[in-house]
């Protein structure tokens, strides 16, 4: 697995080693020891899987009381995935990074706790799978508008 820190260094792009031939492919999608070395010591407690159609925008969601870290990947289709730093004491507060994730590039994005997260589906359909560091709590769910002028996505 290759780990690449992005313009906001706490957000990390993961690119797996894919072994493929005419029969198909194999790839390792997560290894705790490597993840801790490159991204920090986090425990994942919930996995989610969503499906969306072209043009659907999900997010940008974040939490205040129990912020979720998310390791996200696309297993079908393509999305433009965005993380916005919502940590008020961070030197990158209000800044964002975005990456295309797809079934073809097989890349994943680590979005740490304290970030707003969302994605836009750019293919006909997309299936999105992600691990979370805390449980979903609808009472602690907040949204940031994708076109917020101060963020400037």
Give residue spans per PLM region.
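Short beta-strand His + acidic residue motifs that chelate non-heme Fe in jelly-roll/DSBH
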Residues: 109, 117-122, 130
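Non-catalytic, conserved peripheral segments adjacent to functional cores
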Residues: 1-104, 123-125, 132-153
